[in-house]
Amino acid sequence: MNDLISRAERFARVRHEGQFRKGKAQEPYTIHLEEVAALVERWSGSERAIAAAWLHDTVEDCPPTSLAELETLFSKEVADIVAELTDDKAQPKASRKEQQIINAPKKSNEASLVKLADKTSNIGAIANSPPHGWSLERRLEYIAWANTVVGNLPFLPAEGISEFLRRCDQAELNAYDDLGTVRQAQNASLRILERRAKRLGSSESQIRKFMLGFLEGAL
């Protein structure tokens, strides 16, 4: 492993020690960081981007970590990526979420890649281990918000956006399966099948034929 990346990993593991994800599984927070870094690497991210993936929540969630400290330890370039990914915790949560939408188009390519990986990991967690007590509406609102943020990013590798959308589909389907009615779950399945067919380039007539066959139990 590259020295920069291994140092960033060690630093993040120490700073995030004792933190857990919000999902029912209560996984150590470092599981999220591992996945984000792995996705950035898989999508051909630079060494700086992979290091930033490990560090992206340290300033926000691990006081007294600062951008100045990250610059000293890991370089200005890495610290700048982390700065692009750090919310202002002094702002209300609703404002921070709105700022993520507004600021997404301004992200550098490296920050865009880490943000995409971060949202992909979070959506996967919503699909498989959602936070305790989240209603159907809250899950769907999060999925829609994450889609808006990602849709505004200026750099989206094809493999990355494909994985993100696949997890969004699964998160929506699981939400309806867990908390919706049978009819809602069926309708969600149809919407997801239609979206996937469109992403694969199927024509309107092909999609119509497929959906009719599905509804008639021909598949």
Go through each PLM region and give its residues:
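Active-site helical microenvironments for divalent-metal-assisted chemistry
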Residues: 1-219
